[in-house]
A protein has these predicted regions:
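Bacterial N-terminal signal peptides
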Residues: 8-18
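N-proximal helix/coil linker or "cap" segments that precede and/or mark the start of modular domains
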Residues: 19-35, 52-54, 106
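Hydrophobic beta-strand anchors of alpha/beta hydrolase catalytic cores
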Residues: 59-60, 90, 136
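Structural microenvironment flanking redox-active thiols in thiol-disulfide oxidoreductases
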Residues: 71-111, 119-127
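A short beta-strand-turn-helix
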Residues: 37-58
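Thiol/disulfide oxidoreductase modules built on the thioredoxin-like
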Residues: 106-114, 119-166
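Positively charged n-region of N-terminal signal peptides that target proteins for export
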Residues: 1-7
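Short pre-active-site segment immediately N-terminal to redox-active cysteine/selenocysteine motifs
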Residues: 56-58, 62-66, 132
Length: 170
């Protein structure tokens, strides 16, 4: 019994040391995001570096069609983006491999998503060690990751406050 307890405690200690070492998405703040190009539901290509030539910030939202918090935050993201469209570009990328472009297009129409929508063909979510969705990144000049947030935002105001904070820094 004593050996079993010692073994369990040793395993728990190892796990507690390993978890902080994991590459959590938040740990990528300050890093440069690899440039990427993805096809959008509009049939056009979205390239991160090109979007940053015309916008101060790019918001990369990683989501899935089956994710309730993702669906809940899209109307808020849309509303905020419409107010900031001249300075902030948004690309929403599904991380669900099973989501076809037809499924994504219908989903975007259903949720009134007018910003760019596509699939995470560049595997951003995986490269950032993503485990939870939605995960949203703010990218600034030079493709620098300024912020990473896991979980949905509860209002358009939450997005606009976030945009204002990082526009002021750029």
């Amino acid at each position: 019994m004593k050996n079993t307890l010692s073994l369990i405690l040793a395993l728990l200690l190892c796990l507690s040391l390993a978890v902080p070492a994991c590459a959590l998405p938040e740990n990528y703040v300050g890093e440069t995001l690899e440039d990427f190009t993805v096809r959008t539901t509009a049939g056009t290509d979205f390239t991160l570096s090109e979007a940053l030539k015309t916008h101060e910030l790019v918001v990369v939202n990683l989501w899935a069609t089956w994710c309730p918090p993702c669906r809940a935050e899209f109307p808020f993201l849309e509303e905020a983006w419409e107010q900031y469209a001249e300075k902030v570009e948004v690309i929403a990328l599904t991380v669900e491999a099973k989501d076809t472009m037809d499924v994504i297009t219908k989903f975007a129409e259903q949720y009134g998503m007018k910003f760019s929508v596509g699939r995470d063909e560049a595997n951003i979510f995986r490269k950032l060690g993503g485990m939870y969705i939605p995960t949203t990144l703010i990218i600034g000049a030079g493709r620098k990751i300024l912020a990473v947030e896991i979980g949905g935002k509860p209002s358009a105001a939450a997005f606009t406050e976030w945009f204002d904070r990082y526009l002021a820094k750029e």
